[in-house]
Structure formats: structure tokens, C-alpha cells
């Protein structure tokens, strides 16, 4: 065999070996990337579960609310535990207080209402959606105002809107300027999780549009 042919064959073998090694390394990299993606997705699934999805979709649609918002509120209020009761008496998936729930029951004309009925997921979601719809109407559909009011009460948020430290226009709030405390933390988590639930589970327009008003007379 001529020396030039031997050298050519050796070079070809080296090129093929390098190409094969590169392909193997690329395949191994892609496998690692896929496993990392699957692990990340599992972590999201574990941290952001979705239960009662049919009820959330159906009832939120009745009140023209984003199901992602409802799922996020439920996640932060009760972690989807339907019978949980807080130390201050809030109950169920959306952690409704007794006085608020009784007022909502009156608005919904539920003459047979009892507080323990809020352990029922559909009932609790309906009450929570009614209340969020009411707050959305009151605060012109501003997401931050609505979420803060759900946590701290509408009177507190009205006072924040009247304070130039927290609102420059009396209509919207600046989250970075809100007073430090549980409501600021809560609102940040709900709005963050809203985006995650929206991206992962739901395909719907953003919640910033104003809902149809409920009868609050």
C-alpha cells in the first residue's frame, strides 16, 4: 500500500473517530438537557398543582375572571386543601372569613347558607369568585388592587390609593412602594403564581380587563 494511501486512511479514520465522539457527546448533552427539563417540569408540577380545574374554569367564567387568578389565590390561601381553617377563622379553598362569607351568601340569596358549606369546593370557589368580581369592579380591574384588597380588605386599599406614597394617580398601586408586610408579600406571590398558572395550565386573556359587575346593592 502506498504511503500516501496509508496516511489518507489514517486521517480518514481519525476524522470518523472525532465525528463519532462529537456525536456521542452531543447525544449525551441532549439527554442531560432533557432530563434536566423533565426534573424542572416535575418540580413545577409538585410546587404548582392544579386541583378542581373543572370547577375553577366553569365558575371563573361565570364571573368573567381568569382561572389562573383563581388557581393562584387558592394555591396561596389553602394549597388546594378544601377543609382547611385558619387560626383567625378563614375557611376552605379560598379562605373566606365568616362575616365576608355571610355577606356574600346574602348577595347570592342563599337562605339556607351555613358556614360549614364552605368546605364544599364548588361553593367556596363560587363565593371567592363573587368576591373577586366585586373587588375587580370596585377597583376598576386593577390586578394589584384586587389581590391586595382580597388579603387586607377594601378599606385598607382605599386608604392606600388615597396616599401619594403608594399611589400616584389614586387608581393604581405601585407594588414596590407598598408598605412592607404580609399584604405586599401575599400580592407578590399571587401575581407571580398567576403567571405560572397562566403559562402552565390555561389559555385565556389576561385578567386585567374589567369583569362584568355583580349585584352588590
Predicted regions: what they are:
Residues 8-25:
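Hydrophobic membrane-insertion alpha-helices, especially the h-region
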Residues 27-217:
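Catalytic glycan-binding domains that act on GlcNAc-containing polysaccharides
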Residues 1-4:
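N-terminal Lys/Arg-rich, disordered targeting/topogenic segments
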